[in-house]
């Protein structure tokens, strides 16, 4: 019986062993089973599923990179740790409804190459700077590199919008933009261009003369026009010209916006510019720029929105201020409302008229709910009804913040929304030259740009920056005149772009005054300043 069982077991095991050997084979050289033939016998479901996950993950990473580069507006290659905001900002704001045109992207890539070739530290830059040291005799040769230098001037909001304008001009005229500002500027903003710098070197030949540049300077464009010292012949021997385009410029300075003068400026290697204006609207009225600008910006009212997001990335120090505050006070809200309050002619304290105007605006426009009265205030909202709105207030004082905070703490709202009022700082007054003041100002502008809806004050470049970066059509609190409340208290902006506060009113061809807000449909008068100019669409 025992022998029979052993034979039966042997008869079963031998065929099975032969089948296994036939299927797998055996490599005597390395002792490993050859499984290649076996692997092809049936599909590996797990492997296919993993491949699908990898493809999906790769696509998500690709989409993430594309979002962080703002639809091609930015380029990769920067060290992420050197400028966290460049790669993280998209996580804090909704995707822009405005897409940069392919022509704008092409112009930006071409400019980046120009800046890399001609920027500080290159042989071309050194040769071009030598022209400033030579005696001005004969024609100047700058080896194809020309420059426009932005002089540090005015408050931070004005600086940001004016630099964007100068950069646009640089792209239109194939010049390299260099900005004065030194360490403080570098403390606020990351470098926008890869493998180069946009900061004017401290030892720049003319830097020591900047404080003396003015409307009566020997090389001032406007003054030379006034004295009839500038023409096609004389300009060819100039190494530089000073352009005074600040709010107080005169009729001769404003000739900068004429075609004839642009033709003269083409031949000057160095243009030194002082401006605190967003003068882009008037560039659209120069015939030689018109077609190019139209291709760069099919949506005319998005010039600062695109250029601002391209140029201005908060430094790591400022980005820390932004992200810490956002996470602490804004991240969990169902809706974020920005409220930028700037009262220019109020000596001190809180104005009851301004308070009334603010409350009327936010409630009439359904940005914040009205207060509940009577029996209704005792009804508790359900979980579904409960909605948190976080209001970010920016102001030099705390008065308006305290009023709103108390109002929405002590009273329920008719919508049962819970309203949180927050204010990051209250500096008392503008302190342009203080580093921490500017850090906070830049952080607050950026925080406002991250909100879903925004209210800004008339005339304020602080608000313009926030509106433009966010691509928002803000509600503008109209400026009070003769101590009376405007009716309506606020109105919606026509586009996200800033207002040009001091435009020229001159027809260069006819050589006479004209209303430059009625020349083309996309350059209109501003909502908050009747004489200002603004780029708009479909109005």
UniProtKB/Swiss-Prot annotation:
Query: In which tissues or organs does this protein occur?
Result: Expressed in roots, stems, leaves, flowers, siliques and seedlings.
Q: Which GO terms describe its molecular function?
A: fucosyltransferase activity; galactoside 2-alpha-L-fucosyltransferase activity
Disulphide bonds annotated for this chain are none
Checking Gene3D superfamilies in the record gives: 3.40.50.11340
Q: Which residues lie on this side of the membrane: Cytoplasmic?
A: 1-5
| Transmembrane residue ranges | 6-26
> Which pathway does it serve?
Protein modification; protein glycosylation
Q: Sugar-bearing residues?
A: 44, 231, 482
InterPro entries named in the record: XG_FTase
UniProt keyword Glycoprotein, yes or no = yes
Recorded GO CC terms = Golgi cisterna membrane
Query: Where in the cell does this protein reside?
Result: Golgi apparatus, Golgi stack membrane
Q: Which residue stretches are annotated as topological domain Lumenal?
A: 27-539
Q: What keywords are annotated for this sequence in UniProt?
A: Cell wall biogenesis/degradation, Glycoprotein, Glycosyltransferase, Golgi apparatus, Membrane, Signal-anchor, Transferase, Transmembrane, Transmembrane helix
What's the Enzyme Commission number for this chain?
2.4.1.-
* Membrane topology recorded in Swiss-Prot or TrEMBL: Single-pass type II membrane protein
The answer on whether this UniProt entry bears the keyword Acetylation reads: no
Tell me the superkingdom of the source: Eukaryota
One GO BP annotation of this record: cell wall biogenesis
Its biological function? May be involved in cell wall biosynthesis. May act as a fucosyltransferase.
**Family assignment from sequence similarity:** Belongs to the glycosyltransferase 37 family.
Name of this protein: Fucosyltransferase 2
Give the species this sequence originates from. Arabidopsis thaliana (Mouse-ear cress)
Q: Which gene encodes it?
A: FUT2
